[in-house]
Design a protein with these regions (language model features):
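Generic detector of well-ordered secondary structure
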Residues: 9, 17, 36, 115-118
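Periplasmic/extracellular, small/polar-rich flexible segments of pilin-like filament-forming proteins
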Residues: 43-163
Length: 163
């Protein structure tokens, strides 16, 4: 009886961690898909000016499992029920309007934050957790700063900038 009780307790401890890892992996894949979709959409354009969630939804950039609602009312959300926002930015090397774009992920729990950032940041120009830059332009990811920033809040906003 004691062994069964120990197994049940272990399952309750391990299962949430496995679930968190699976959600983090799925969201890392979604971020890569979104980035690739935006770059493909704007291949022939001179900048990312005009990029919005509406444009991205109409161009089918977001994976279907991320969309809440349908048609023009579809809104991208992540696995944590946080908003996902695409926007043109002026944070590329030239600092020109539309020289870069951002993918913003809201409401990311601390348990998944580090896993998502460490999996995705290498493909981006810069990465922020909240207001903390954890990967500077042309730099490498600061894993210690990422862990500290992610664990500083129960719900995090991640901003990935791509050029």
């Amino acid at each position: 009886m004691g062994i069964i009780a120990a197994l049940v307790v272990a399952a309750f401890i391990v299962y949430p961690k496995v679930q968190a890892s699976q959600r983090a992996q799925a969201e890392s894949n979604n971020i890569a898909t979104i980035q690739a979709g935006v770059k493909a959409l704007y291949t022939s354009a001179s900048s990312f000016t005009g990029l919005t969630n509406t444009v991205a939804v109409q161009a089918k950039i977001f994976p279907d499992n991320m969309l809440s609602g349908s048609g023009t009312a579809a809104k991208p959300i992540n696995a944590f029920k946080g908003n996902v926002t695409l926007a043109a930015a002026a944070t590329g090397p030239s600092s020109a309007t539309g020289s870069s774009f951002t993918i913003t992920y809201d409401n990311v729990p601390a348990a998944e934050c580090v896993k998502i950032v460490t999996a995705a940041a290498g493909n981006f120009y810069t990465t922020k957790v909240g207001s903390k830059v954890v990967k500077a332009a042309d730099g490498t990811l600061d894993v210690a700063a990422t862990a500290a920033a992610c664990n500083n809040a129960t719900s995090n906003t991640l901003v990935f900038t791509s050029i």
